[in-house]
Amino acid sequence: MPSRFFVTGTDTGVGKTVVSATLCAALDAIYWKPVQTGTREGTDRATVMRIAGIAPKRTAPEVYRFSPPVSPHLAARLAGKRILLRNINLPKIAPQESLIAEGAGGALVPLNERDLTTALMKRLGLPVLLVTRTSLGTINHTLLSVAALRAARLNLHGVIMVGKTNIENRKAIEHYGQVRVLGRLPLLPQLDRKALIKAFNSHFDRTAFVG
């Protein structure tokens, strides 16, 4: 059964792309970032191909690409465009293929003057993985994001933490958020396919990512 998820985070820079690359490498999934900003500094698609060791054919092209490293709604406006949800549809892939879709920033990042990223998640209908830090402040940030996802009536599949071990923060998130923490991705000294797969096998239960 294929694994298909939408990856969001509590903040920009929290580790969504590395988590997405890890899942693509470990689950042999296709990578897709429908809305990409900051292309002048490179794309997350290129990063995932490089560190996960996957070919271009194992990725789907972005629907919207913008050069400035700013929020999608602003990047589109600066380009004289508007992001339309109706233009963003799941890529056409074989039924048996797994898919990892990565959002731009967090769950409440605006895409246009009306729609937030939660609206895109709802349109795509994929179970959501929330990426969060393990460090101080993560409880508040994670619980706020969990509340936002549930308010939007999205299927929150679980939380993935990134960073050093912090058992107390993990327990607090599971208790107060009533959500599963699926595992923790440590800060890796080297980012390549072998290291990502090893980290996944050491810190996650593969069965938690089935369908």
Question: In which residue ranges do the predicted regions lie?
Answer:
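Conserved glycine(s) of the Walker
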Residues: 14-15
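N-terminal phosphate/diphosphate-binding loop that engages ATP/GTP or pyrophosphate donors
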Residues: 4, 18-84, 90-93, 97
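Short internal beta-strands
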Residues: 33-34, 129-132, 157-163
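Switch II (G3) loop of P-loop NTPases
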Residues: 87-112
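Inter-motif core of Ras-like GTPase G domains
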Residues: 112-135
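Hydrophobic anchor at the beta1->P-loop junction of P-loop NTPases
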Residues: 7-8
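C-terminal lobe/tail of nucleotide-utilizing enzymes
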Residues: 146-211
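Short, structured coil segments at secondary-structure junctions
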Residues: 52, 124, 176-179
